């Protein structure tokens, strides 16, 4: 772990930029085969022009093709990271930095709605944006510039003492600050439930709430960190450590195996419940369950509806192919589940940074 606040999330953000998480795709709503939305709009034109090449280089890394291009890409990434480290060092003395944009915001912040502090390449920030959009809450997003050290601004550190994104200000609760993505999601659904009486993306049943919490904590503690570490050791660590790449990639696969099994069980229960005329044949194994007209119906981790337990996975599922995992082939239930969520208007809006 890095000692300086924000260095790890900064490196991951640059990592995601350099492996083509940077360009919004206007055709994402109609693409049925590729569920990858592009997060960042803040990359330069050179990165945009080379995005297709960079993406192909990453996908072909395991097969050994395009070796020289892969090496060039990795060298470019290392150079970018070195520049980033130098910038971080230059801004380490906070007395020499004027955070005018952040200071101005805190002097003129709105009185209603929410303010989300995020980064254009931070999956956890988009996780919060998705839930805000799904709940219909009015919010503004400030995408911090880590290269300028905005996450170290004293005003922002007062919102999140860990100096990382996401962080949220609830202006309707006397400018309450919430940090850590899981805590933010729980705050939002509980507030919506209290205000409307509708447990949207949540539940009014204590048992279901406990299960939602379990999956949410599993995502924040096991799913996201493992993908982040796999990305780091695959592309950005100063030394090539094959065992580290293998260890974290295998752990990501293990995590997806847990989710795949849970969704498959939900799928089987749904098909057996709805397709009663063929249930006996499915049970006997004489007819594959995949032939059921209900086989592509959406299933969710908890109960029979979409919750924050499901949505929390979306932005990270969206980048997992960068570590060589094809969820469409390896984890088909996870793929279908993610695809259903990625088609939702609120999810599309949030992932586009709108």
Swiss-Prot record:
Domain GST N-terminal positions: 112-196
Family indicated by similarity: Belongs to the GST superfamily.
GO molecular function, one term: glutathione transferase activity
Gene3D superfamilies recorded: 1.20.1050.10, Glutaredoxin (3.40.30.10)
Native source organism of the sequence: Saccharomyces cerevisiae (strain ATCC 204508 / S288c)
Variant or mutagenesis effect after changing residue 122 to S: Reduces glutaredoxin activity
Region annotation (Disordered) ranges: 22-76
Annotated function: Plays an important role in nitrogen catabolite repression. Down-regulates the expression of many genes involved in nitrogen utilization by inhibiting the GATA transcriptional activators GLN3 and GAT1. Under good nitrogen conditions, binds to the phosphorylated forms of GLN3 and GAT1 and sequesters them in the cytoplasm, preventing transcription of genes expressed upon nitrogen limitation. Is also an atypical glutaredoxin without a catalytical cysteine residue. Has glutathione peroxidase and thiol:disulfide oxidoreductase activities in both native and fibrillar form.
PROSITE patterns: GST_CTER, GST_NTER
Record remark on domains: The prion domain (PrD) is a Gln/Asn (Q/N)-rich domain, which is unstructured in its native, soluble form, and which forms a parallel in-register beta-sheet in its amyloid form.
GO cellular component: cytoplasm
Compositional bias ranges of the Polar residues kind: 22-42
GST C-terminal domain mapped to chain residues: 205-354
Protein name, per record: Transcriptional regulator URE2
Localization of this protein: Cytoplasm
EC number: 1.8.4.-, 1.11.1.9
Residues that hold glutathione according to the record: 124, 151, 164-165, 180-181
A Pfam family of this chain: GST_N
Modified residues annotated as N-acetylmethionine in this record: 2
Keyword Ribosomal protein included in the entry's annotation: no
Catalytic activity annotation: 2 glutathione + H2O2 = glutathione disulfide + 2 H2O
Note: [URE3] is the prion form of URE2. [URE3] is the result of a conformational change of the cellular URE2 protein that becomes self-propagating and infectious. This conformational change generates a form of URE2 that assembles into amyloid fibrils. [URE3]-aggregates sequester soluble URE2, which then fails to retain GLN3 in the cytoplasm, resulting in GLN3 activation and consequently derepression of genes that are required for utilization of poor nirogen sources. [URE3] can be cured by GdnHCl and by deletion of the molecular chaperone HSP104, which is required for [URE3] propagation. Present with 7060 molecules/cell in log phase SD medium.
Spans annotated as Prion domain (PrD): 2-89
InterPro entries: Glutathione-S-Trfase_C-like, Glutathione-S-Trfase_C_sf, Glutathione_S-Trfase, Glutathione_S-Trfase_N, GST_C, Thioredoxin-like_sf, Ure2
Assembly and oligomerization: Homodimer. Interacts with NNK1.
GO biological process: negative regulation of transcription by transcription factor localization; nitrate assimilation; protein urmylation; regulation of nitrogen utilization
């Amino acid at each position: 772990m890095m000692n300086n606040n924000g260095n790890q999330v900064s490196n991951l953000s640059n990592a995601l930029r350099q492996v083509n998480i940077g360009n919004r795709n206007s055709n994402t709503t109609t693409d049925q085969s590729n569920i990858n939305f592009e997060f960042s709009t803040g990359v330069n034109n050179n990165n945009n022009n080379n995005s297709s090449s960079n993406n192909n280089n990453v996908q072909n890394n395991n097969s050994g093709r395009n070796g020289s291009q892969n090496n060039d890409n990795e060298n470019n990434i290392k150079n970018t990271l070195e520049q980033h480290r130098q910038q971080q060092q230059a801004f380490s003395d906070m007395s020499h930095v004027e955070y005018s944009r952040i200071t101005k915001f805190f002097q003129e912040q709105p009185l209603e709605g929410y303010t989300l502090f995020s980064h254009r390449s931070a999956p956890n920030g988009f996780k919060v944006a998705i839930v805000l959009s799904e709940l219909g809450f009015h919010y503004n997003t400030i995408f911090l510039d880590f290269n300028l050290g905005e996450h170290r601004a004293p005003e922002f550190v007062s919102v999140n003492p860990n100096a990382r994104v996401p962080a949220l200000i609830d202006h309707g609760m006397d400018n309450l600050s919430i940090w850590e993505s899981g805590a933010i999601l729980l705050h939002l659904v509980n507030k919506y439930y209290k205000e409307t009486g509708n447990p949207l993306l949540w539940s009014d049943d204590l048992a279901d709430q406990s299960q939602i919490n379990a999956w949410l904590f599993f995502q924040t503690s096991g799913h996201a960190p493992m993908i982040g570490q796999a990305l780091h050791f695959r592309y950005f660590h100063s030394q090539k450590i094959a065992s580290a790449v293998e260890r974290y990639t295998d752990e990501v696969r293990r995590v997806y195996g847990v989710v795949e099994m849970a969704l498959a069980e939900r799928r089987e229960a749904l098909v057996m419940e709805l397709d009663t005329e063929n249930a006996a044949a499915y049970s006997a194994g004489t007819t594959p369950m995949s032939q059921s007209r209900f086989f592509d119906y959406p299933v969710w981790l908890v109960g029979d509806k979409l919750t924050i337990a499901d949505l929390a996975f979306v932005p990270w599922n969206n980048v997992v192919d960068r570590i060589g995992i094809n969820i469409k082939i390896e984890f088909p239930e996870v793929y279908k589940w993610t695809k259903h969520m990625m088609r939702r208007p609120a999810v599309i809006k949030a992932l586009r940074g709108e």
